[in-house]
Amino acid sequence: MTAAWVSRVSMSPPLIMVSIAPSRYTLELIRRNGEFAVNIVGETLEKTAYGIFGSRTGRGIDKIAESRVKARRGEKTVVPLLEEATVALECKLVKTVEAGDHVLVIGEVVNALKFSEEQPIVFTP
């Protein structure tokens, strides 16, 4: 899933927030598994981020296989990390908060990996 809203919540402990629509399969998986990753991508994966990860559900397809992006299991979690991302943040779920038409997913960053020097893309509405 491509997230439009990601923000730091706390430095100690290191917490981040991702805003996810309640209908998203990603939210179901996060609640079930108690962990997630935020893969921050650069221009190399921009079309893939929006075209496959951002617009299609993973309920019926393997998005990683379809995108042909190299991925590996996290070091501190079992979630996939995209090796072509600039940075990957492994997170343990702390809590979810219903907020209007989205759910705020708050996670503690338990590991951060830098894969490249590429500048990350930033979504600007």
Where are these regions (language model features)?
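Basic, polyanion-binding surface patches
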Residues: 1-125
